[in-house]
Amino acid sequence: MPAYRSKTSTAGRNMAGARSLWRATGMKDDDFNKPIIAVVNSFTQFVPGHVHLKDLGQLVAREIEAAGGVAKEFNTIAVDDGIAMGHDGMLYSLPSRDIIADSVEYMVNAHCADAMVCISNCDKITPGMLMAAMRLNIPVIFVSGGPMEAGKTRLANPVTKAVEFKKLDLVDAMVIAADPAYSDADVAEVERSACPTCGSCSGMFTANSMNCLTEALGLSLPGNGTVVATHADREQLFKRAGSRIVELARQYYEQEDARVLPRSVGFKAFENAMTLDIAMGGSTNTILHLLAIAQEAGIDFSMNDIDRLSRVVPQLCKVAPNTNKYHIEDVHRAGGIMAILGELERAGKLHTDVPTVHAPSLGDALNQWDIVRTKDEAVRHFYMAGPAGIPTQVAFSQNTRWPSLDLDRAEGCIRSYEHAFSKEGGLAVLRGNIALDGCVVKTAGVDESILVFEGSAHVTESQDEAVENILNDKVKAGDVVIVRYEGPKGGPGMQEMLYPTSYIKSKGLGKACALLTDGRFSGGTSGLSIGHCSPEAAAGGAIGLVRDGDKIRIDIPNRTIDVLVSDEELARRREEQNAKGWKPAKARPRKVSAALKAYAKLVMSADKGAVRDLSLLDD
C-alpha cells in the first residue's frame, strides 16, 4: 500500500521540527493522521478570469477539512493574454505555462502534499497546472473559475444604419476599434459591453477550450467548462471538488487504487480530449498544450495522432469566434461538454472505458450527465443555468435559469453526427515544404471559399511589422502574410497573433488573405490563420526561406501547404541563410530579458508542444 507522501514530514521522532512548523500553521495532533491536500489557487486582480477566485480556495479548503483532510492553499502566477497582447508582454505568456508547472511541482514536492485541487481558469494556467498534475501523478481535481457571460448591446450597422442587437466578446472590441466605419462612441459602447463579468472570455477561446478539455480528460466535474462564473451552481463544483479529493486520496493511499491518478487516464483520454477539441472547433493553442501535457504524462501522443483524428471527427458545435450566434453560455444550455461527448459516443468516436474523478468510467458519467439520455431531472435543471446580464466581479452572484434547454440536435448549438456542421472537424494539421513538421489551422473559422487558397507572400519579421503593414494598407487581397521569428525560440515566447488577424478582418480582408506564422494564435482568432509552423524560423525552418512575392498554396482538404519554389532554389537559399545565421533580417526593438533568453535556450518547436528539450540537461 503506498504511504501517504505527507508522512515524510509529519511522522517519526526526527520530524519534530517539521511538525512544530506545521503546528504553527494551525495543525493539531489529529491532523497528522489526515491527508494533506494542496489547494492550488491562481487568484490575481490582474485577470478577469481570476479576479473572483480570492475566497474560493478557502471555500474548497473548508470542504476538504469537513471531509477529513487538511487543506493548505498556495497561489500561482497568472498572465492575462488579452492585456499582454500586442506588445512585449506577450513574450511572457507561453513561458509562464512552464513557470506555473514548475511552481506547483516545487510547492507540492517541497511540502509533501498527498493530493491537490487545482483552481485554474485562463489561458496558460490550466495547461500549466495540468502539466504539473501529470508530472507529480498524485490525485487531483480541476475546478475552474468559469466563463464570462457574453456581452450584449445594441449598435447601429455602419452600412444599413439599422440598430441591431449584438452579442459581444473581447474580439469584437478589437475588430470594431480598428474599423473606421464605427464612431468613437460605438467603440466606447462595445468596449464597455464586451466583457461584462468576471470569468474567462465568453467564446471558445483558449481558456474555455482547456477547461472543457479537463472534462474529456476525466479530471474535472461535469459543467466545469461551461457554467458561467457568476452562477450559483458553480459554487457546488467547488464544494464537491473539496470533498471528492479527500475520497480520491483515500482511494489511492488506503485502497491502492491507482485508477485515481492522473496518468491513469492514458492515451485514450488524450484522444478523447483532442476529439472533443476538434468537434467543438476549439483553440489551436489546445494542440500545443495537449502535446506538452502528454509529454509530462509519458504518453506518446503526437501531431500524427491529431492529424489522424482531424480527418474523421465531425464538427458538432460552433461557438464564437467561429460564429456570433453562440457563446459558452449557450453550450451549457445545450447540455455542455457531456452533451458533445454523448453525441461523439453515438457517432462511434469516443473511448468510454476511461476513468474520471467523478465516475468509474466516462461511459458511466455519460449515462447520468448526457441530457439526451439522462432521466435525472436535477441534471436537466443544472444545464438550464444561464447568464443574468448584470455586470459584476462577484462569483456565484446570480441564479438565473434559461426558460428551456436547447435540445435541437439538427439546428441548435450542439449537433448530432447526422446534422454536423461538417463531417471533418474544426482543426487541421497541414504539412508541406514550408512546414515539414506541420502547422495548424482552425478550420471552423475558415470560410468555405478559401479552404483552398493560393497567394503571394508578404514577408514580415515580427508581429509588430505585420500589424503596421496591415493598418497602413500594405497588405492586399491575395496576400499570404508571413510572420516569422515569432516561434518559441525566435520570439522568444511564441506570441499570439490576435491583433494582426483582427486587423485583417477590420480591413475587409478576412476572406481574401491568409496569415502564416511560426507563432501562435489566440483562441479568439478566426479566418485563414495558420500557426505553429514547424520547424520555426529560428530553428532553421523553411518559413525563414520565404521571400516577398513567392507563391504559397494552401489546400486544407488535402492537408497541404507549400511555397511554390523549386527544391534547388530552397537549397540555395538555405546555404545563404546558414551563412547569415537564422535571425530576423530587420532589427527589432525588442527587449529580451535574461529569463526569456534562458527559456529560448531550452524550448523546442511547437510540434513538440514547445516544451523544454530535456536532452540538453543530460549529464
UniProtKB/Swiss-Prot annotation:
Q: Which reaction does it catalyse?
A: (2R)-2,3-dihydroxy-3-methylbutanoate = 3-methyl-2-oxobutanoate + H2O; (2R,3R)-2,3-dihydroxy-3-methylpentanoate = (S)-3-methyl-2-oxopentanoate + H2O
* Cofactor detail note: Binds 1 [2Fe-2S] cluster per subunit. This cluster acts as a Lewis acid cofactor.
Please tell me where [2Fe-2S] cluster binds in this chain.
122, 201
For the biological process aspect of GO, one term held by this record is: L-valine biosynthetic process
* SUPFAM superfamilies for this protein: IlvD/EDD N-terminal domain-like (SSF143975), LeuD/IlvD-like (SSF52016)
Tell me the route in metabolism or biology where this protein functions: Amino-acid biosynthesis; L-isoleucine biosynthesis; L-isoleucine from 2-oxobutanoate: step 3/4; Amino-acid biosynthesis; L-valine biosynthesis; L-valine from pyruvate: step 3/4
Instruction: Specify whether Amino-acid biosynthesis is a keyword of the entry.
Output: yes
Q: Which residues bind Mg(2+)?
A: 81, 123-124, 496
Indicate whether Protein biosynthesis appears among the record's keywords.
Answer: no
As given in the record, the signal peptide range reads none
Q: Which residues carry this modification: N6-carboxylysine?
A: 124
E.C. number: 4.2.1.9
GO MF entries: 2 iron, 2 sulfur cluster binding; dihydroxy-acid dehydratase activity; magnesium ion binding
Name the domain of life. Bacteria
| Record key words, sorted | 2Fe-2S, Amino-acid biosynthesis, Branched-chain amino acid biosynthesis, Iron, Iron-sulfur, Lyase, Magnesium, Metal-binding
Cofactor(s) the protein requires to work:
[2Fe-2S] cluster; Mg(2+)
Enzyme active site = 522
Q: List cellular component terms (GO).
A: cytosol
Coiled-coil segments: none
Subunit and partners: Homodimer.
- UniProt family annotation: Belongs to the IlvD/Edd family.
- Protein purpose: Functions in the biosynthesis of branched-chain amino acids. Catalyzes the dehydration of (2R,3R)-2,3-dihydroxy-3-methylpentanoate (2,3-dihydroxy-3-methylvalerate) into 2-oxo-3-methylpentanoate (2-oxo-3-methylvalerate) and of (2R)-2,3-dihydroxy-3-methylbutanoate (2,3-dihydroxyisovalerate) into 2-oxo-3-methylbutanoate (2-oxoisovalerate), the penultimate precursor to L-isoleucine and L-valine, respectively.
Q: Which PANTHER family match?
A: D-XYLONATE DEHYDRATASE (PTHR43661), D-XYLONATE DEHYDRATASE YAGF-RELATED (PTHR43661:SF3)
Protein name per the record: Dihydroxy-acid dehydratase 2
Instruction: Tell me the organism.
Output: Cupriavidus pinatubonensis (strain JMP 134 / LMG 1197) (Cupriavidus necator (strain JMP 134))
Its ancestry begins with: Bacteria, Pseudomonadati, Pseudomonadota, Betaproteobacteria, Burkholderiales
Tell me the name of the encoding gene: ilvD2
